[in-house]
Design a protein with these regions (language model features):
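Structural beta-alpha unit
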Residues: 1-3, 16, 23, 45, ...
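Small/aliphatic-rich secondary-structure junction motif
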Residues: 1-50, 141-199, 280, 290-295
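General small-molecule cofactor/ligand-binding pocket signal
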Residues: 36-38, 74-78, 129, 177-179, ...
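A short acidic, glycine-rich active-site loop
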Residues: 49-50, 198-212
Length: 300
């Protein structure tokens, strides 16, 4: 899989940082990609001594990365708010993928400030891979959550995440679970909530199921079953609930999904599904934005 050529790892002291680095090294080696390992120190932590110690630590780390087979390795010590400095680095150096580890649950911190991972998924212009600790590598089971529509922009993001998930499944020889959660919409939603016969209700549900199945089959037509061990799921219901059920039932290792639910206010929202999954699931998550996404973070 030669998709990524310029990878950034946001490295910190959290549990799971080593796991994120290990996965980034593996992908960089497979892609012959440049790898940048960055530590972001908050301004209150960035004493000259702390910066010097961090630089020396990164130098030692880079030798290990090179020994693992990555020839182009850069290290950086940045100062400021972690997610802001990481995104600014992405803009400056045109990174095409960011690795970060999930932070330990801290409800108050996330309520008032938001986690670094959540901010990256919301606002980073390139794909973001959030690694949760102790995930097995290579992955055995990958879930891609799609929502095929008629809209060109939505078709585009579905194709992006399908391409990426299929490439990863092929690389790791993993089972690829493809899920599209659907529900009744429009006037039919009012109809099934009203007093109609069982036969009428079932006819409405069948019509919507078939419509979504057709859209999903059209999307999957470009991904031959002979090349992938794939399982297709078409549950009715809210996407975040369907994803959670499937993650637990199938013991999914990685979720690949889009992170922008609506186009309109760049960067200041995240699709409800992606944010819910990011905060609740214990597997790693790779999120992708549509082409043309504009980050609200300035490069300086």
């Amino acid at each position: 899989m030669k998709r990524f050529t310029n990878i950034l790892v946001v490295f910190n002291n959290a549990i799971g940082a080593e796991d994120a680095l290990e996965q980034a090294v593996s992908l960089a080696r497979d892609n012959a990609a440049r790898l940048t390992v960055a530590v972001v120190l908050r301004s209150t932590e960035a004493s000259p001594q702390r910066i010097d110690e961090t630089e020396k630590r990164l130098q030692r780390l880079s030798l290990g990365v090179q020994h693992a087979g990555v020839s182009e390795v850069d290290t950086l010590v940045l100062t400021g708010t972690p997610f802001l400095e990481a995104i600014r680095q992405v803009i400056r150096a045109e990174h095409d993928l960011v690795f970060a580890c999930a932070e330990p649950d801290n409800v108050l911190k996330q309520i008032f400030f938001g986690s670094t991972a959540t901010h990256l998924v919301r606002k980073c212009p390139c794909p973001v891979w959030i690694v949760k600790p102790t995930q097995p590598v290579p992955y055995k089971k990958i879930l891609v959550a799609v929502d095929p529509k008629i809209s060109t922009s939505e078709d585009q993001i579905n194709s992006l995440i399908m391409d990426l998930a299929a490439s990863l499944a092929s690389r790791d020889h993993a089972v690829l679970h493809i899920m599209h959660a659907w529900d009744v919409d429009g006037n039919d939603l009012d109809s099934i909530r009203s007093e109609i016969t069982t036969e009428q209700r079932e006819a409405i549900l069948e019509r919507h199921h078939d419509k979504h199945l057709l859209a999903l089959n059209n999307l999957l037509a470009g991904y031959p079953t002979s090349e992938l061990d794939r399982r297709v799921h078409l549950p009715r219901g809210r996407p975040e609930q369907a994803i959670s059920r499937l993650v637990r039932q199938e013991q999914i290792d990685l979720i690949v999904m889009g992170s922008v639910g609506r186009i309109g206010i760049p960067g200041y929202f995240i699709g409800d599904t992606a944010e819910t999954v990011l905060g609740s699931e214990r597997c790693s998550i790779l999120t992708v934005k549509p082409n043309g996404f504009k980050t609200p973070v300035l490069s300086h």
